[in-house]
Structure formats: C-alpha cells, structure tokens
C-alpha cells in the first residue's frame, strides 16, 4: 500500500533530523546528551507528530495568513501535526464576558486572553490528557524532538513521584537548599509515567518564553514553599554560545550565561516567566486555568503576565483541589516547569513580518528593515526552522550538511554540532 503524501513528508523530516543529529553528535562533548536521546531513558512517543502530547494547537488570527503559511511549513519540515485555534479580535470581546468585571483590560490583551481561553476550553471539552499551545510567531530548532526527549527526562525531577513511596518527586527534597543544581546524568529513575511522557503531576510546561528566573529557596526568604532545584543539561549542542543568550539583540545577556558553563540548558520550576510562545498544559492544568481566568479572576494585564503570576503562586488559594502538592512543594500550588534557554522562541521575520498584533519584546527596537536589524532572527535557537526554511524546502544541495545554517555562524563541525563557544 503506497504511503500517503503526509506520511512521506513526516518520514523525510525524520530522516533529515536523524542524519543531522548523528553527523554532528559524535564528539565526547555531547555524549551525555546523545546518550539521553538514544538510550532507554528516552520516551519514543515524543518522536510522534505531537511531541508526546495529545495535540498541538497554534493560535492564529485569520487575517495573518503570512504567519499561518510559515507555521504550516515549519511544522511540515519538523514532522509535526498542528491544529489551528482562531485568534480573536479585541472588538469581539465585550465587557460582559470578561471575568470578575475586568473592564480595564486593554484591547489587544482582550483578544489574546480569549484566544488562549478557547484553546484551554478545547482541551477540557475533549478531555485531552495534555496539549501544547503555540503562538503563530514561534520558532524552534530542527532538532526539537531530540531536545524534547532530553527535557522530558529532566522535567520528571519535578513531575514524577520517586520509587521511594513518598508520592513526591525529587524536587520536594530540596526546599531548604540554596540553589541546588544536579546534572541530568545523575538523576534517579522514577517509575514510568502513565499519563504523559513528561510526568503525571504537572499543570504547565513553559517551553517558549522571553525570560524567566531561577526559583528562590526558603533560605532566601521565599515564603511559599517552592523547590529551587535546577537540573542542568551540560554540553547541549543546541544551546547558543553565552553571548547570544538574550531575548533580543539589545538586551543584556541572561544570568544563565554567567552561572553555568557554555552550552548548558537548565530545567527548573517557573519563576517570573514572561511571554507565551509555547506552553503545554495537562488536563488538570487546563481545568484550573479555564476556571480561574475564564470565570473567577478580575484581569488587568496581558495573558502571559497573568500566567506568570499564577505559576508564581500569585493566585494561590486554600480552596481544596486548587493545585497539588507535588513539584511545587506546598498544598494547593500549581506545578509549572520551565527551561532556559527556551526551546521555542519569538521569530522576527525579515521585512517586519515578526511584528506582533499585541506587543513585542525589545521596547519597540526590533524593527527589521528599519535600520535596527539587518535581517530576521530568532533568539536562543541555533538551527532555526524558519531561518533555514528556504533551503530545506528548495533542497539547494544534495548534501544535507549544506542545507542547515547556524544563525550565529559558529561553523559546521566546531560550532553547530559540537558546541563551539
């Protein structure tokens, strides 16, 4: 029976990714990353077309056909299957539907809020175990599926109970430790999760953002019990050199660049995270968010800031069932896991195509083609799908190596696959 066109496209995308990975991952500097991708610790379901989630939703205003075209191609080249959620115009969100009388919410924020509520509503309505929500300006690395396998292993330190029988994950043991950091290679193996390959006791995985901070410990005066545990992923060939670890070209470098060796990615609980290029929710997380911000809370700011406050326990309530006590460390607290640098990031397209319909990071300085930036770019992403899209679609070379370009020009062998600094 002949393969369907979509099956052929997914197969080709997988072969290209596999070829690139093996070509550039043969040095000892990335051996631990390679081991986690190829060993029994890896979750094979993450290699599917929805990254191990039940669905991938992408929010897109119907008028932004340019963005829909770009995401469609990026997903096809990455072997991903996406489902569209129509964006909402602010004019279509009257005061009477805003929760808690949120009449001071700005116009652009209204439409964004409702679109995200519609995505959460779909997840709850269809009783999905988990789903990934993307915004239509998101970009990612060609090696995304391998990245997600490594992330899943690290995330279980916060989302999966240990074998000890305590019913709590590893992170629960580190509330009083000052900034504990554990290498991903030294993590104990928890029982296999039953609900998602990322663990069973999480609410939100914040995978794409424009900034986050490490959680403070109880010793640092943190009044709410949240684990400061950090899981370090060393020698990650997909992490940019330290000087490029910033949310936009005019920003200061992230503290991560000074705190860890080059090419280290760190997974930890969310703290002060902003922007919602990509986040996953579990069924329990979607229900909590839809209730809290679709019905109960008065909103005065953008959805990403609201979501950040929720993960930071700003909306903590003693109401039974409002959160759980696993990864977060206290009864009634949401479990939000993030990663820095992020795995998804905002793409600034050539010719101003990356301009947001709401607002954008960079204080208005990111205007491609207006003397500020000479060409399109994506913070934090080395082998950008969007920046390599033309070459991957047109196939300008019989050698796959010649198709992929690191946007920071770190070189093919030394910088791309082997983590040049």
Predicted regions and their residues:
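An acidic/histidine-cluster motif and surrounding catalytic segment
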Residues: 2-134, 138-421
